[in-house]
Every structure is written in C-alpha cells, then in structure tokens.
C-alpha cells in the first residue's frame, strides 16, 4: 500500500509553511486537484490528510472521498510546554487535543510526525507510549518518529528543537 499527501499542517497559523493558513476553500480545492491528478496516474494510491490539529481544522477537510487516513503532527517541546501549559506534558496530553478534533472524521489516524525535545526525564515521559491506554485513542494506527533537528525556527525564540532519538533515551521509546 502506498500513501500520498500534500499540504501538511495547512491549518497552522505560525507562518512556517507558505501553503498554511490559506482560505480554507482555496486549500480544499487545491488538495482535491492534487488527489484527482494523482488518481489519474496512480489509482491505487491512498491519501493522507495531515492537519496540525488546530481548532479550525474541519474547515480544511476536503471530504471523505479525498481522505483515506489522517496524519497529525505531534511535538513535545519542554520549554514551550512549561511556558504555555505550566509544566511538562506526556504523550497522551500532547496528542489528545488534535486527536479529539480529528476523530470526528472517522478515519484511521496516524501521527505522521512525532518528536520530543527537552531534558532526559521529559523526553522519557513524552516517549512512553506504553503509559497510554489504547482505548483512549482507538483510531490511532501508527506513529512516525521525526528523529532530526528541526529545519526551521520555532516561534517565540524557541530556536530549532532537536527531535533526534539519543542513546540516553532510546530505551524509553516503547511500543
């Protein structure tokens, strides 16, 4: 099975991607055009719609005929968590808001980009998938770990987070 996608994090307002935060109808039309064009040449291809998971993500949904699965971006950045939430968040706390917004489409959900950056204790807690009851996220089918240094600056002077799995925390990455 092959999956294609286009225009990830289209609902993001942070200005990191030139295609994000378009007028929703413009994005939907462009996404549908992409899928229609691909289907002509690769009819067996499936399509992943990959929002950031913001409150208005539904406005960017291109419709059930254009989405086979949903891919969410989920990142845990300790300095951001402490500033925005007053403390460290675990895997479930990071995923829940965007998952809850995406589950209403009743499509399989993947975390198409996942990473944690912070001290060893934070990264261990963030990566502990075994601490989550699978019943809490029944549509979640897989996770792709984004093990790289962020290519672009994060807002609010957070710099370029380092999402790489390191020897001191790789034993805490649990299935």
Regions found by a protein language model. Name each.
Residues 60-119:
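Glycoside hydrolase catalytic-domain groove-lining segments
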Residues 1-10, 73-75, 114, 146-148:
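Short loop/turn segments at strand-loop or loop-helix junctions that form parts
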